[in-house]
Amino acid sequence: MIAQVSTKAHRARFLNACRGKWVLGATLPLDLALFSKSQPWRFYAGPTLALELSGSTAWAAGHANPEELASFLAFCGCESIILDENECPPPAGWCKAETLTVFGLAPGKALPLPAADETLWAGLTHGREPSAMDVARALYPADTAKQEDFYSELCTKRTRGKALVWALRQRSETICTVGAYTLANRQAYMACGQTAQPLRGKGIGGQFCGGHRPRGGVCPYVPCQSVRHGQYDIEGRGTA
């Protein structure tokens, strides 16, 4: 039976389902520790399942009965779920929307850095502790609600040493950013690597993102090994 994480037994089930997993083994336990009493997060556990809900999207570690999972997600008003296809059967009746591939770089390894436009690169300013709101606006320029949610989550993690973010600025504008948005369980989950549209294809994103990673721990971000996560939705808006 899937139940809200409200007891020590539920918490133990949740953490056991996450143990040893790439990305989900870091992000879900940290989110539970930081946001278990905050909206819009909700956390549930089954005998072999950890489930995090935020808005209409769910993240699952472990596995559950497909019929039970589909019924539970419908009850919670979820429209999509991200899960490890090698471990968790999709909810009954749901269709795959896309495949998300997670890459990992082992400790001590480095990325080959692509060539960047030297003139452009020389005119950029490197920000090691950029404003959380500046980063939020760069990532979600047209969505103030997402900006506010991103800002709140990043500030909460940053103040506890659980996230690092870097940015490149061209004059006063943030034009490239990447971050380790979860630092937990010897993993550094790198995400939200993005370059402003007019400057893409000039090598600055690859040069910048490839040159940043926290020290120590596996970095589930770049090639060495890979894990495929599937995103499924109830309406089957696409296939992959």
Residue spans for each PLM region:
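Conserved acetyl-CoA-binding loop-helix of GNAT-fold acetyltransferases
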Residues: 65-72, 195, 201-215
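A conserved beta-strand-loop-helix scaffold within acyl/acetyltransferase catalytic domains
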Residues: 149-194
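Conserved beta-hairpin
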Residues: 33-54, 162-178
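Short amphipathic alpha-helix that is part of the acyltransferase structural core
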Residues: 1-26, 110-149
